[in-house]
Amino acid sequence: MERIKELRNLMSQSRTREILTKTTVDHMAIIKKYTSGRQEKNPALRMKWMMAMKYPITADKRITEMIPERNEQGQTLWSKMNDAGSDRVMVSPLAVTWWNRNGPITNTVHYPKIYKTYFERVERLKHGTFGPVHFRNQVKIRRRVDINPGHADLSAKEAQDVIMEVVFPNEVGARILTSESQLTITKEKKEELQDCKISPLMVAYMLERELVRKTRFLPVAGGTSSVYIEVLHLTQGTCWEQMYTPGGEVRNDDVDQSLIIAARNIVRRAAVSADPLASLLEMCHSTQIGGIRMVDILRQNPTEEQAVDICKAAMGLRISSSFSFGGFTFKRTSGSSVKREEEVLTGNLQTLKIRVHEGYEEFTMVGRRATAILRKATRRLIQLIVSGRDEQSIAEAIIVAMVFSQEDCMIKAVRGDLNFVNRANQRLNPMHQLLRHFQKDAKVLFQNWGVEPIDNVMGMIGILPDMTPSIEMSMRGVRISKMGVDEYSSTERVVPLHQSKVECSSPHLL
């Protein structure tokens, strides 16, 4: 307070004000700060004072033959004085206006080809339908999503070689175009861009957009294909969502979808053959999607799906350590466990052989309408923090986590026989039998689970067996969070070949 008074006192004296406003800056440290290096230290200020000058732009001398010295209003467009330190002409911003209005019109045929991704986006938005806005709590999960629709699936290195070959064909440097897609794209683009007058650097930037998949880790509630991600800012906020139907599909989303379908068919067929691994690899090598070999797509495509992961693992590619169970993607974020077969008795005295996971583990669970963090030990749920859109979604997540925990009270809550079958009329494995049973009716499971008093933690509440929220009691270990839970993005590992079939499909359930 004393300092402020002192400063106010100083500022009230006219001499102080004069010193501060009129004296030149000649302190070496300040001069150094603003003059060392080529990086502009205050671009906004620089632009302001440059534009206040009469001739802030410099241009090649040829400009004097292409632009008159004065415009129709008699204002000077360029100065006869040379720019100090170069042999360029100093030009007024008015010259830009003159050029835009009266300059030559070039051939525009290349613009839609170069800015293809932008033109296509405009078309998609024009033909898309925006529906009503709903106000509700949005549960967003950070996921790795594709942010530029319409791209090919080249790796950064492959794209770099294609771009160099198309834009700078005479530059020195070894470029090896090996893959079929590289050669096709190069040929196509060279033909498209004959006599193109757009700056090569801009062409290179735009080609990169077209050829390489760009992904970001973004909070999303709802559709994750690239045609939805490009309008993310229009379709979801913190407390609202707007319905949207894209006005067109794009190749990369189709490829992702086709890849999942192809991988599922291949895994299904390989599973019943004499040598599953050899047969799976043979099918991956002989399959094409949209004219590109499936093995090439698998190397570049980051789609995380069970069957796709099995194919990648079989090829010795890196896959993420996630697996699916009960419609949720589980990712282990810490801990480890060993598997051991154990026989357990249900409440109906039916014997089940389950693979018990011994050890402490933490998981994130990500579903379409709910997310959760699960901490568990051997056959024991320690903590479950759930976040979901509504009561139904939260209940689904709790059932899946309780079954996954393999707790004895869950197995004892079974009433009646477990005899669920899949579409091929084969009996489901015990874990899925249990899941199906409780998905039909979880009343006994929730009642048998037990409740506990809870502490008042900000952003967290309890949930009772009848699914009503409470701030005093909650089912043992279970809490509801107002915020979403992020998908875990950094646990990646390489699955050894010999165990790919088992490890990748569902390490915790097979």
From Swiss-Prot:
InterPro entries: Flu_PB2_2nd, Flu_PB2_CAP-bd, Flu_PB2_middle, Flu_PB2_N, PB2_helical. Disulfide bonds: none annotated. Pfam families: Flu_PB2_1st, Flu_PB2_2nd, Flu_PB2_3rd, Flu_PB2_4th, Flu_PB2_5th. One of its GO terms (cellular component) is host cell mitochondrion. It is found in: Host mitochondrion; Host cytoplasm, Host cytosol. Keywords: Host cytoplasm, Host mitochondrion. The keyword 4Fe-4S does not apply. Transmembrane segments: none annotated. May participate in the inhibition of type I interferon induction through inhibition of the host mitochondrial antiviral signaling protein MAVS. The knockout of PB2-S1 has no detectable effects on laboratory infected mice. This is PB2-S1. It comes from Influenza A virus (strain A/Puerto Rico/8/1934 H1N1).
